[in-house]
Amino acid sequence: MFSRICSAQLKRTAWTLPKQAHLQSQTIKTFATAPILCKQFKQSDQPRLRINSDAPNFDADTTVGKINFYDYLGDSWGVLFSHPADFTPVCTTEVSAFAKLKPEFDKRNVKLIGLSVEDVESHEKWIQDIKEIAKVKNVGFPIIGDTFRNVAFLYDMVDAEGFKNINDGSLKTVRSVFVIDPKKKIRLIFTYPSTVGRNTSEVLRVIDALQLTDKEGVVTPINWQPADDVIIPPSVSNDEAKAKFGQFNEIKPYLRFTKSK
């Protein structure tokens, strides 16, 4: 898949770009879990990840040891997020916020996992600052040491300028967030520039919305918050809506509000 891959084991593996889209996830998974010693990235080889794409699997070194991403997630939801660098101000506030809010993610059956291109040793030292700032005993989730940029490449966690430097060791990841459901489908993608910190309340809000819409077959309007009214999809007839939801408020034939259960 890459223009050059320096690994004896990979030379024994068939590497061809799939001609059919449904084969892509299988190829990505093989790439992600194979041992890679060095490589030359090409932008044309990069996986195209979209909402409802299979989340690529991978093996990685983390602050809790080696993990397989799918095994770590199990049958939970997942939030994979990257930060540009350890011991930097915005990243410190972000990871501290995720650590402090871990109980809220636990309530929603969501597992967190962070990432940057520093090694695990750097992460472990930085975690001491995180614990102090967040006032927590433990961060509560692993942070990947993506020193070879494998996961950053898989999940396109770089900006246009950074991609030019992906092979020279100077790349830093942007602030990416991937929400992944128990079927290992990517359900939501956020990408923030390095200068702008994320909003953890928004991450929780969209998880609430995704889980609610999956469960009840509704959709959520702009600025929706838990306990707000939801929208009945246009594909549901009025008779079906009455049977399923009871009372609803019809603004237009295509815009009908109801209470969530």
UniProtKB/Swiss-Prot annotation:
Q: Name one Pfam family in it.
A: AhpC-TSA
- Targeting presequence: 1-13
Q: How does activity depend on pH?
A: Optimum pH is 7.0. Optimum pH is 8.5 (using glutaredoxin as electron donor).
Q: Which residues carry this modification: Phosphoserine?
A: S53
Matching PROSITE patterns, A to Z?
THIOREDOXIN_2
- Top-level taxonomic group: Eukaryota
Record keyword GTP-binding present: no
Task: Please give the NCBIfam families that the UniProt record associates with this protein.
Answer: PRK13189.1
In the record, the note on similarity to other proteins reads: Belongs to the peroxiredoxin family. Prx6 subfamily.
Q: What is this protein identified as?
A: Peroxiredoxin PRX1, mitochondrial
Its source organism is: Saccharomyces cerevisiae (strain ATCC 204508 / S288c)
